[in-house]
Amino acid sequence: MAGSSSVQPQFIASTGNRSFSNAPLIENSDPEQIIVPDRKSWKNLFAYMGPGFLVSIAYIDPGNFETDLQSGAQYKYELLWIILVASCAALIIQSLAANLGVVTGKHLAEHCRNEYPRIPNFILWVLAEIAIVACDIPEVIGTAFALNMLFKIPVWIGVLLTGLSTLVLLALQQYGVRKLELFIAFLVCTIAGCFFAELGYAKPDAKEVLKGLFVPQLKGNGAAGLAISLLGAMVMPHNLFLHSALVLSRKIPRSMHGIKDACRFYMIESGFALVLAFLINVSIISVSGAVCNSPNINAQDQENCKDLDLNKASFLLENVLGSWSSKLFAIALLASGQSSTITGTYAGQYVMQGFLDLRLTPWLRNFLTRSLAIVPSLIVAIIGGSSGAGKLIIIASMILSFELPFALVPLLKFTSSKTKMGIYANSTTISSITWVIGFLIMAINIYYLASSFIKILLHGHLKLVAAIFLGIFGFLGMAVYLAGVAYLVLRRNKEATHLVALTSENPQIANESGNEGVYSLPREDIACMQLPQRRSNANDL
């Protein structure tokens, strides 16, 4: 059997005194796999390119657009340093997610299912699904705004059309993960090209932009709150599940240098993609800052700058820079909304498969997620119009801030655990840095949520009885929320599955255990992007 090319190699996994076979999810399949050559060469980087661009979409989605526009309109270039800090933190955290998948052969949602009892695991799944729906709302509204700008389609009709347009783009999944990665990379470059063109025409002061990037400052009322929004919008919970799964589409050499090279190359390719996303965010803030502080701006546009959203930004750019700039903005917004939805659909698939071992076809998964996002978006668009839809994006961002610890804490704990990562667990230094970053992000998000809630109580014009009951239930909810975060932080990891070949200094151990060949098994469900039903396997215990 060892010499047969039709036999798939298998992981040899260990849970203390017991080992079992982690068999492929598709039998006798021949998916479009991306095979990394077993050689020490920088040329291998091209085989790893792709997942970073899918992940980077979350950093340039319509929700980020709106926050960036408001930042530039109200504080010009003063908050650019927040984008720089957040991008550096995002690169570190995303690299941990990639490492988890590379080293263990399982993605974050699967680790959560193996680690936590049934009820906590179910709660984590529900929270992850809510986060994906909350992330989809800005994509729906952003795409609807873009269609309105380009074709004068009413926003509420655009909301309905978003479901159909995304289903068409999801047809790409039948061509495999590589084609999807190339298409998303094209959309990212399209977004970049649009905003770089806007930046070149707006001509912001280069010295002021550099000062905003490297001189931290928070001046004026509301600057701290907007800075928190910028930070909260940069690290998305669904992205951690997505990145840890996408890396499993590569067939990498199972050796010490093979695993280390994979982790290093994934960090480099993620760096390329996130640097491009960083430059796009800087461009949006700079264009907004330059336009709203232009000496040629009229009184009406000055008023729009005080409460700038995606829809108002189109008219603002058209009035100040010309009609072509409005079209470029709409094209970038459309590309952002569609690409974000595609990656969100696949993140939802991996979350459902990982937590529940349940798989749906992409179109059905997209239909369910998009339906939950379209309903509130459609209601708000019909009743509240464009301004109401813009406010819904802010609410969705708050929900994502609330959700982040329930994906971030498990990731930090798993990647720091030798029972899961073996010799590839985070070093003490890396663990300290990542936990500081994690606690800082969580503290910022919790502060943002608490301060927003208190603001509603004090300035929401509520009746006394309503304010009292809202306060009681609100603070009770915060207590439960903090207790849930504390449970994840303080709970000790149990002895969990990890790959023997990846936790031993001697690769020969793997071969003695029954592993065939030098390559680790790619996850065919990830490589094909189909997530089929698991078949029973006689080797599984």
Curated annotation (Swiss-Prot):
List UniProt keywords, sorted A-Z: Glycoprotein, Ion transport, Membrane, Transmembrane, Transmembrane helix, Transport
Q: Where are the transmembrane segments?
A: 45-65, 78-98, 122-142, 153-173, 182-202, 222-242, 271-291, 315-335, 371-391, 392-412, 430-450, 465-485
Highest taxon, organism lineage = Eukaryota
What membrane topology was assigned to this protein in its record?
Answer: Multi-pass membrane protein
Q: Where in the cell is it found?
A: Membrane
Under the heading InterPro entries, the entry gives: NRAMP_fam (IPR001046)
Question: Listed GO molecular functions?
Answer: cadmium ion transmembrane transporter activity; manganese ion transmembrane transporter activity
A GO biological-process term: iron ion transmembrane transport
Cellular component GO terms, alphabetical: plasma membrane
Q: Which residues carry attached sugars according to the database record? A: N17, N426, N511
Family in the record? Belongs to the NRAMP (TC 2.A.55) family.
Q: What is this protein called?
A: Metal transporter Nramp1
Q: Which organism is it from?
A: Populus trichocarpa
